[in-house]
């Protein structure tokens, strides 16, 4: 493998209640004439010791039994187990809601809006804004129900005498006032617009009340589910080896994966290239793998349903090493970039070269696709960035002092940002719409970069044997660093991968593949096997347990789980000479 001077931009390298909520007993009643809101608020704030409010369960003593039972009761009702929920309330002596809250909720269900507003104020919530918002919600439903049965005078009185005096949500008051001009049209629009609830949907009112009133008063319907999901997600996120779908999480035991979830066993060795393999990339649909080599060829590999990989096409036509091969957004075509030579576009199905892109007197050293697949971008040897349509017509070409020798280039999925290595230690983020540029300035030479699937992060490989993860939303900032791999002379490429791209993988000059946990930066596994520097790695976007690595030893290793290796141990490793793949020569113009 050739050595590149570190002083030059490289081609391949320089490489929380009382037992009875709110202090009310289950059989108590509250009269507005004898108890004011402040005293009720005090009752809410002071639990009754006789009810055992301070009793806790669990080994750590942080779970109040009354809250725990109420949440279970709420979940039972939500699941439709009404009899079981009622039995739990009776047996435990812990009511889901006190009598006043029960009365309030029933009044809402029955559409007794005046009574429900009065009961709301009797409860004595300390947050006046929340009470006003809840009152507005109840009165709005009252207004809409009058409107639906064409009781226009009653609707107007509700709006003028009850809602407007609250002095909140003025815009909505004006909208409702306008509806009095043509009630039927308003009702029709409200009930027929996608995503809108029917105007008489009292259940919707109850749902919205949950967002306005304290959870200690009206326990959210899905509270238990929310707690359980949060617990599972925390367990998942703290597991550095987690590399399975959420459907595999279980409530029966604490979640903890092992290294067996990380692709760490050689499943196949692909040996069709005759020289160093410099680049490889899985297709977006995960059905293919493409590789390029110093041997001046590129190969398209096909992946079967069981994960076995076989040669599909060998792409011949370049007269210099092929430094990169990139998939079109629809995976129907690939681009290959010859080292300071030409860019060629190939059809995946046939293996034919359908077009060649070049510019007189200068050559490409990097290339990429437009996100819609209808154009090509390239960094050129004369420090310019050129863009062509598929037919080779030049669309844009930036020249001059603004650009440097561009050794890596990409465009975000929305087509807004053009990302390129524009100087030895600088990455340019150019906003094509606003024509403004942001820069990521590193402390050492940048050898390559990779964008995350969501285009919010960029992984940067540096000459000093460090990989840095930058958040590029807003002002760019470093969020993590990865160390351990070896790099001194060559371009080494890294990638995101695994479940929700939770891992970082990289090649290394010591012939190993390195994998880190993305969030913590912890090195979790080193994969030996290659006999030469590992130049590039790619993680399948559809198979969480498939990783590919390209090496100077002329081979591509496919890494999988232990069980995958066992399933394939009797199968012969893929040999280029025994493949049925076809060699294609480029006749593109």
From Swiss-Prot:
GO biological process assignments: leaf senescence; response to abscisic acid; response to absence of light; response to auxin; response to ethylene; response to light stimulus; response to osmotic stress
Q: What are the record keywords, sorted?
A: Cytoplasm, Repeat, WD repeat
Keyword presence, Cell membrane:
no
Transmembrane residue ranges? none
Per UniProt, the ranges with Low complexity bias are 25-39
The main location is cytoplasm
> PROSITE patterns per the record?
CTLH (PS50897), LISH (PS50896), WD_REPEATS_1 (PS00678), WD_REPEATS_2 (PS50082), WD_REPEATS_REGION (PS50294)
Q: Boundaries of each LisH domain copy?
A: 64-96
Q: How does it assemble?
A: Interacts with RANBPM.
Record's function text: Acts as a component involved in the crosstalk regulation between light, hormone and abiotic stress response.
Protein name from the UniProt record: WD repeat-containing protein 26 homolog
- In which organism is this protein found? Arabidopsis thaliana (Mouse-ear cress)
